[in-house]
Amino acid sequence: MVAGLLDEAAAIADFRRELLAWYRAHRRQLAWRQTRDPYLIWISEIMLQQTRVDQMDAYFARFVQAFPTVHDLAAASEDQVLKAWEGLGYYARARNLHRAAREVAARGGQLPDTYEGLLALPGVGPYTAAAVSSIAFDRDHPVLDGNVTRVLCRLLRLEADPRQAAVKAALIAAGEQLLEPGQAGDFNQAMMELGARVCTPARPRCGECPVARHCRALAELDDPARLPRKAPRKPRPHYQVAAGLIWKGDLLLIAQRPSEGLLGGLWEFPGGKQEAGETLEQCLAREIREELAIEIAVDECLAQVEHGFTHFSITLHAFRARYLSGEPQTLGCAAWRWVDPSELGQYAFSRADLQVIEELGFLSTGDNS
């Protein structure tokens, strides 16, 4: 049966039945699986683009409590949306979600119910369009995320690089063939669940797999975990970053990053990357001058945080600093504010800055001289 999974209708029917029976018996009880509301399903799928299921529950609950309908999300400010998204990372998702909500609200508040209509929304790619259209609207579109790619590569023993366009097209075609018509939502979620919980990257639990008898990698390879082929990892550059907790009396200076680009729209303790030949203190003074056009005195380092992004990592050194002169300007930021430390919770910060805030507890306003 292994050799003919995609060639025999009976094998495909068995595969569907076995997979769906396993899913219905073992699926996790997740908030976004308890609804058919397209808006809530859309929110969950945008979050799942770069966030593991086991990390998402609290974030999903917080976000939909803040914005229970697409009209609520559309009416919010970008700052409110970013604050509700705070901690999830990949903030372009939140900005695109906000833009898309405004488009949907302007057209009456009904999310598009087709793959093509969903694909036209900001921040919606082929995976999200397939997931939402199948789960919310019963459209027969297979999903192809990392979990499903891994499952299909092993089932079919595809040894070519799944990032290649031709291989990706073959995987989508296989998904279309295997898909249970009329049950695409459950089928897609079953495939993703199988990849997340059983057909895992490093140590697949083949003995627990409901469709193991169809798997060519299990039948023909000594180690199914060899598939899919993994690209060699490129070394990630590491940067030293200095940030300033700049006091003016009892107030702290915070700056908002430009809306486009990394961490767009988030607030931060201003600073930047250390350049060759300068100390961290010199780096901070230079960055503040270039970004805000003010002069500061840099004092001691208060906290040090390690943080990783997709393509690089940083060590963030947070320094106490004192404002000396100049009127802040938006030379390298979107906005700036002097705030009482008690007000920091009103602003959306990156995870690295949140770690600084948490580590410092925060500073007592009386200890800033």
Descriptions of predicted regions:
Residues 269-303:
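The catalytic Nudix box helix
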Residues 220-268, 297:
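N-terminal strand-loop-strand
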Residues 1-14, 361-369:
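Short, low-complexity, intrinsically disordered N-terminal peptides in bacterial proteins
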Residues 208-242, 308, 315, 347-363:
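Acidic, metal-coordinating catalytic segment for phosphate/diphosphate chemistry
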Residues 4-9, 18, 22-207, 211-220, ...:
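Catalytic cores of DNA base-excision repair glycosylases
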Residues 318-364:
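NUDIX/MutT-family hydrolases
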Residues 23, 47, 191, 209, ...:
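A residue-level signal for conserved active-site and pocket-lining positions in enzyme catalytic cores
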